[in-house]
């Protein structure tokens, strides 16, 4: 099984763009790739993360279980829509069915690592632990990111879940002292796999492909699918 879970230190941190960039890089290097988003909220406002991944990355193997209209945490969004979150078993079945030998299967969470995404209160951390999958954490570059990143990494370590490193989700065109210092500090916490420029999600396919192919170390990505 070659599953990589993608989480973030918060909502709106750039998980979907990071997932798309990694998926795009893998595709351009000849790696079979699938993307799972078990729970999606905010569809009423046009949020459709898998559609965004398809637009940016050109990936067609896309898998989801539950979609809720309001841009809320999954549990609240499900309750307000009169529905229930999927079960933990359903989420695990979705991911294992999408994965296959030689394929890199990316699993994007909703919100942060410890947000409830299943009907029994299970979180993305629980899913990663069940799968024995490493977790890539998307982080912000600005003030507050060090504390948020450490908390997420400690939450992974508490369950003996491997960290696959960090992606800076929105690196500014003109970084200030805080961003530059934070990038150095983040690299001491875990490997920084990429620093994606702010606004990358607004690029067209060709420009996004050029960005993605240079964003990650090809040997690291190939190792994920091995």
From Swiss-Prot:
Positions that bind ATP: 12-17, 49, 108-111, 197-199
Subunit and interaction comment: Homodimer.
NCBIfam families: bioD
Enzyme class: ligase
Entry annotated with the keyword Coiled coil: no
Pathway(s): Cofactor biosynthesis; biotin biosynthesis; biotin from 7,8-diaminononanoate: step 1/2
Pfam family, one: AAA_26
Binding residue positions for substrate: 41
InterPro entries for this protein: DTB_synth_BioD, P-loop_NTPase, SDR_fam
Cofactor needs: Mg(2+)
Family: Belongs to the dethiobiotin synthetase family.
SUPFAM superfamilies per the UniProt record, alphabetical: P-loop containing nucleoside triphosphate hydrolases
GO MF annotation, one: ATP binding
Chief location category: cytoplasm
Gene, per the UniProt record: bioD
Keyword tags: ATP-binding, Biotin biosynthesis, Cytoplasm, Ligase, Magnesium, Metal-binding, Nucleotide-binding
Annotated source species: Mycolicibacterium vanbaalenii (strain DSM 7251 / JCM 13017 / BCRC 16820 / KCTC 9966 / NRRL B-24157 / PYR-1)
Location within or outside the cell: Cytoplasm
Residues annotated to bind Mg(2+): 16, 49, 108
Name of the protein this chain belongs to: ATP-dependent dethiobiotin synthetase BioD
Superkingdom of origin: Bacteria
């Amino acid at each position: 099984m070659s599953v990589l879970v993608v989480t973030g230190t918060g909502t709106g941190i750039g998980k979907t763009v990071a997932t798309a960039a990694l998926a795009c890089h893998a595709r351009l290097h000849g790696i079979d790739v699938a993307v799972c988003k078990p729970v999606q909220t905010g569809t009423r406002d046009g949020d459709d993360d898998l559609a965004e991944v398809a637009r940016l990355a050109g990936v067609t193997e896309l898998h989801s279980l539950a979609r809720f209209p309001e841009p809320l945490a999954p549990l609240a969004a499900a309750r307000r829509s009169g529905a229930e979150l999927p079960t933990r078993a359903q989420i695990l079945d979705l991911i294992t069915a999408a994965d296959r030998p030689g394929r890199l299967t990316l699993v994007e969470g909703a919100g942060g690592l410890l947000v409830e995404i299943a009907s029994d209160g299970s979180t993305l951390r629980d899913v990663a632990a069940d799968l024995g999958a490493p977790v890539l954490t998307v982080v912000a570059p600005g003030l507050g990111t060090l504390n948020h990143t450490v908390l997420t990494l400690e939450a992974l370590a508490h369950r003996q879940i491997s960290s696959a490193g960090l992606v800076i989700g929105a690196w500014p065109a003109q970084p200030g002292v805080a961003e530059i210092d934070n990038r150095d500090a983040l690299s001491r916490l875990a490997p920084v796999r990429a620093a994606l420029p702010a606004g990358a999600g607004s690029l067209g396919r060709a420009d996004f492909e050029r960005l993605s192919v240079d964003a990650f170390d090809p040997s690291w990505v190939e190792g994920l699918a091995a």
